[in-house]
Amino acid sequence: MLMKNRIVKFVVLVCCLCSMPGIVRAQLSVHQFDQLMKKIDDVLWYEKVGDIAHVDKVILCGPPRWKEFNPTSMSAGNELKFRAYIFIPKSVDENKKYPLIVFPHSGVHADMDTYYAHIIRELIAQEYIVVAADYRGSTGYGSGTYNNIDYGGLENEDVYISRNYMVDNFDIVDGNRVGIMGWSHGGMITLMNLFNYPGQYKCGFAGVPVSDVIMRMG
């Protein structure tokens, strides 16, 4: 039933988009379009990996903004919400524990989408549990999340929080066998997590990572 509901929403979204006059589509903001595409892509996860994995998406809370837009507002100092995808092999035995892979997506102002489905399938086939955070600055959630980017900063904390969420809330996750992997910007987040929390990860892989943030920002 859940899958049918998602498919119905997918069809409605596509039909609405296709039925809009060209001038109306052109007036859609970039963030509105990103949000629409995100909803569609979330449905596609079930098509891409749903045969071998349980797919879920949760809302987590990371640290407050590094610099508040309005320090005197009532919301100043509040934690920031972000989303994280969870992929669990359908073959798991609930009486056993399995290794966890933390998988930060690549790209500045990008997101975790089905572009990575082939990687998720490979990890699931080897019975890894995967958590992939859409950390602050990711696209698909509107201008608020987008503008809260903290390049090389608190985005690393968001990813670490996704790791802790899995270890603390899933009995089938082996907290002593946690790895982290990512490419490009995700590779940088991988390195930062390994440096900042060396005792929390058994291994890591950083593919073509940003390794000098000062040079990159300069």
What are these regions (language model features)?
Residues 1-5, 9-61:
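N-terminal targeting or regulatory segments adjacent to alpha/beta-hydrolase or S9 domains
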Residues 5, 169-170, 197-198:
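Acidic-histidine catalytic/liganding microenvironments
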Residues 42-46, 70-71, 115-119, 190-193:
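Short beta-alpha junctions and helix-cap segments that line functional grooves
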Residues 52-83, 87-176, 181-183:
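Cap/lid segment of the alpha/beta-hydrolase catalytic domain
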Residues 83, 103, 189-192, 203:
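Residues within well-formed alpha-helices
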Residues 142, 191-218:
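Hydrolase active-site cap/lid region
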Residues 182-186, 190:
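Gly/Ala-rich beta-loop-alpha elbow adjacent to hydrolase catalytic centers
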